[in-house]
Amino acid sequence: MGKIIGIDLGTTNSCVYVMEGKEPKCITNPNGGRTTPSVVAFTDKDRLVGDAAKRQAITNSARTIFAVKRLMGRRADSPEVVHWKEHAPYKIVAASNGDAAVEIDGREYSPQEISAIILSKLKADAEAYLGESVSEAVITVPAYFNDAQRQATKDAGRIAGLDVKRIINEPTAASLAYGFDKKANEKIAVFDLGGGTFDVSILEVGDSVVEVLATNGDTFLGGEDFDQRIINYLVEEFKKEQGIDLSKDNMALQRLKDSAENAKKELSTAMETEINLPFITADQSGPKHLLIKLTRAKLEQLVMDLVGRTIEPCSKALEDAGLQTSNIDEVILVGGMTRMPLVQKKVAEFFGKEPNRSVNPDEVVAMGAAIQGGILAGDVKDVLLLDVTPLSLGIETMGGVFTKLIDRNTTIPTRKSQTFTTAADNQPSVSIHVLQGERPMASDNMTLARFDLTGIPPAPRGVPQIEVAFNIDANGIVNVSAKDLGTGKEQSIQITASSGLSEADIEKLIREAESHASEDKKKQEIIEVRNHADGLIYSTEKSIKDLEGKIDAELQADITSKIEALKKVMEGEDSAAIKKATDELASASHKLAEQLYKQTQETSGASGDPTDTSASSSKSGDDVVDADFTEVK
C-alpha cells in the first residue's frame, strides 16, 4: 500500500504533506517552495502550473486561471460568481448544466478540471519526492463548504488520478496538527482566514478525540478580496493623477494585482510601503509611471469592513456551541491573512485573549491532512499504543523541578524506579505529581495524574525512603506507584491516557523546549543552588544544635552569621551570589567538623592506646570496605 498524501487545496496557494514514519513532512515543489501557487495558465504551446504560471500572468492574463476554488460547486448565476466575474481577467461562463466554468480559447473548463490540473502537479511533486507512485490522498475543504462544493473537490481528485480517501474540514485538520499539548479537554477556536474563504470552528480536544462543537464562516471572504481593495485604491489614485482608468487594461491590472499582494504582505511588518510600477500604461504624451505610497493605516481603513465580517460568524459559532468567549482556552490562527496585524487585533479583542501563533498558518492544514492520511493507513494511532513512549515521564520534586524517570523514545514495556525522600521534618505524606513533557520545570509540562502516599511515620527530613516506580506495559498503559521502603506501605495509580499527542505535537514540545533552553537552564540552576543551600543550612543548624556546648563560641558565631547571610541572599535570584554564600558556609562548616574530630581524637588519646583506637575505628566502620577487585573485560 502506497503513501496517503495530505493536500490543502487552497484558493491562492496549495500545500502537500506526507507522513514519514511518525512525522509529517512537507513535500516541496521543484523550485524548493513549500507551497505552490494555485494557478494554471494556457499558452500556445503548453500548460503551466504553479510558479511558472504565476510568473507569466502579466503577459497572459486572459488565459491564466487563479482562485478557481471560488467557483467550485457554484452556479454561474450565483451572486458570488457574478461578483467575481467583475474582477477576474479570465472569462467565466455558464456550463450546460448551469454551473460556473471558465473559457479558454473557446474551450470550457470546469473548476474541477482546473483544480485537477493543480492536484496533478502536487501528485507529481509527491511522487518525485517519495520515489514511488501516489494514488491516494486526503484533501481539505473549508468547514463551511456545502455538499456540492465538497463533491466537486472529490471529483477534482478523481480527475487527477487520486482516490480521495477523505474530505476533511480545514479547521479539523489544523486541530490535528496543532494538537492539544498543554491541557486535556481544551476548548479551542480555529480562526481560518485564507485566500478565498473564511472559517471559524469551535472544537473540544482531548483524550485523542477532536470533536467539532460548531462551525461557521463565509466561503467568499479572503485575501483575494483584500487584494482587490488595494487594486481599487491604486486605480482610483492613478485616475486622479493621470486621468487614465487602468481597470480596463488587463495587463496593468495583473501588475497591480501582484503589487497589491506584495504590499499587503509587507504591511504586516512595515508601517508603509511604496508601490512603484514604471511604464504601467501610456497615452499620446508618452509612458506613464505609477508611484504611490501605501501606509498600514490606509490599508486598514480600506479593509476594515472585510475584517469586521469575520466577527459575526465567530459569535454565531460560539452561540451554537453554547459557549462564551471566556470558555475558549486557545484561539488558533490559520491562513495567510491571519498574519495581518489588524486581523490579529480583532481576534484578540473578540475572544479576550491573544491568539496562539504556534503553528505555521500556510502549512498546518496540509500537515493535519497528512496526519489524517496516516490514521486511515494505520500508520498513525493513539501514541499510547505505539512501541515507544513519545515524551518523557516523571514527577515534580522540590522546587518545582521536573525529575524524569523514563526518557522519551524509551522502548516499551519498561520499568524505571527512583528513590526520593521527604522535604520537611515529620512529613506525614508525600504528593506524587505525575508529568509528561521535556521542559525542566514541572509547571511547563503536562499533568497526567496526582496521588498521595500517606501514613509516613514521623522522621527527620531526608530519612524516609520513598520509591517511585513507573511501569509501562506493551499496550502503553502506565502504572505509577509510590512505596515507603521503611513501612512497605504502597499507593499506585493506572494512567490509561498518558498522551493524547500526535508526533507533530511532540516535535513542537521539543522545539519549544529548545527555544526556552536558556531560560529553563537559569530557572533550573537557581532551584538547584537554592536546594543545595537549603540542605547545607539544615545540616549545619542541626549539627550546631546536636553539639551545643562543645563548639568554640567564636566559630559558632561565625557559622551563625554565614547562615543568616545565606538565607538573605537566597531571597534573591542571583545564583552566583547564592553559590558564593553557600561555599562560605560550607568552608565554615568544615572547620566545625575539624574541631569535632580533633576533640574526638583528643578524648580517645587520653582514654587508651592509639592503636586500639585505630582498630576500634576500623571495626565500627561497617560501611567502609577495603577489597581487591579484578576488572572483567
UniProtKB/Swiss-Prot annotation:
<feature type="modified residue" description="Phosphothreonine; by autocatalysis">
    <location>
        <position position="197"/>
    </location>
</feature>
<keyword id="KW-0597">Phosphoprotein</keyword>
<dbReference type="GO" id="GO:0051082">
    <property type="term" value="F:unfolded protein binding"/>
</dbReference>
<feature type="region of interest" description="Disordered">
    <location>
        <begin position="592"/>
        <end position="633"/>
    </location>
</feature>
<keyword id="KW-0346">Stress response</keyword>
<feature type="compositionally biased region" description="Acidic residues">
    <location>
        <begin position="623"/>
        <end position="633"/>
    </location>
</feature>
<dbReference type="InterPro" id="IPR029048">
    <property type="entry name" value="HSP70_C_sf"/>
</dbReference>
<dbReference type="GO" id="GO:0140662">
    <property type="term" value="F:ATP-dependent protein folding chaperone"/>
</dbReference>
<keyword id="KW-0067">ATP-binding</keyword>
<dbReference type="Pfam" id="PF00012">
    <property type="entry name" value="HSP70"/>
</dbReference>
<keyword id="KW-0143">Chaperone</keyword>
<protein>
    <recommendedName>
        <fullName>Chaperone protein DnaK</fullName>
    </recommendedName>
</protein>
<feature type="compositionally biased region" description="Polar residues">
    <location>
        <begin position="597"/>
        <end position="619"/>
    </location>
</feature>
<comment type="function">
    <text>Acts as a chaperone.</text>
</comment>
<dbReference type="InterPro" id="IPR043129">
    <property type="entry name" value="ATPase_NBD"/>
</dbReference>
<dbReference type="InterPro" id="IPR029047">
    <property type="entry name" value="HSP70_peptide-bd_sf"/>
</dbReference>
<dbReference type="InterPro" id="IPR012725">
    <property type="entry name" value="Chaperone_DnaK"/>
</dbReference>
<keyword id="KW-0547">Nucleotide-binding</keyword>
<dbReference type="InterPro" id="IPR018181">
    <property type="entry name" value="Heat_shock_70_CS"/>
</dbReference>
<comment type="similarity">
    <text>Belongs to the heat shock protein 70 family.</text>
</comment>
<dbReference type="GO" id="GO:0005524">
    <property type="term" value="F:ATP binding"/>
</dbReference>
<dbReference type="InterPro" id="IPR013126">
    <property type="entry name" value="Hsp_70_fam"/>
</dbReference>
